């Protein structure tokens, strides 16, 4: 089967770009809103949004994808800001499975079966400490800290290690 092709921003028509945004951002918003109805009522739940670093390092000919996935990551952070104080048992996390070995992915990418195991394990982990965490493949991406915080942790011999997903 031929691999899907990408089109340069200059040759992509607006309706096609907007469909990509509707799928990636609109789908994330719609699914989260639908799931939250029951979660807010129960006071607990788990949201795991599938994300990417495409907003930080866009690939050529993928502007709509990069913008929409970046907006979805911002939406995840906005959800956390809206809900975490009132509903600490609703756990919200971003997960980036990596480039997959699929028709749309890359030949030497992550086997989809492995990514599925990581995704299921992370989705089933309802530890409230995971709210706001971002995982890439099977490892947490720790937030960047300023020089002052890094020095303080160094002097106090505290080293935070990224969490791992263990399927």
Where do the PLM segments sit?
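Conserved mid-core segment of classical short-chain dehydrogenase/reductases
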Residues: 1-18, 61
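Conserved N-terminal glycine/acidic-rich loop preference
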Residues: 28, 70-76, 104, 112, ...
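C-terminal helical subdomain
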Residues: 90, 94-95, 101-153, 162-164
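Active-site loop of short-chain dehydrogenase/reductase
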Residues: 39-51, 87-90, 133
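Catalytic loop of short-chain dehydrogenase/reductase
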Residues: 46-71, 76-77, 81-85, 96
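A short helix-coil junction within the Rossmann-fold of NAD(P)-dependent oxidoreductases
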Residues: 8, 34-43, 82-83
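A short, exposed helix-loop element centered on a Lys and neighboring polar residues
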Residues: 32-33, 77
């Amino acid at each position: 089967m031929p691999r899907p092709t990408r089109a340069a921003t200059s040759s992509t028509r607006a309706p096609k770009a907007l469909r990509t945004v509707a799928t990636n951002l609109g789908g994330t918003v719609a699914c989260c809103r639908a799931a939250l109805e029951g979660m807010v009522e129960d006071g607990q739940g788990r949201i795991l949004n599938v994300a990417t670093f495409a907003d930080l390092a866009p690939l050529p000919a993928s502007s709509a994808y990069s913008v929409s996935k970046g907006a979805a990551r911002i939406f995840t952070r906005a959800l956390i800001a809206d809900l975490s104080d009132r509903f600490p048992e609703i756990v919200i996390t971003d997960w980036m499975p990596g480039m997959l070995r699929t028709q749309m992915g890359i030949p030497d990418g992550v086997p989809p079966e492995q990514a599925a195991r990581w995704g299921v394990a992370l989705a089933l982990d309802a530890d409230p400490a995971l709210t706001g965490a971002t995982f890439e493949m099977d490892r947490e991406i720790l937030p960047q800290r300023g020089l002052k915080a890094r020095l303080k942790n160094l002097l106090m011999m505290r080293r935070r290690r990224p969490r791992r997903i263990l399927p």
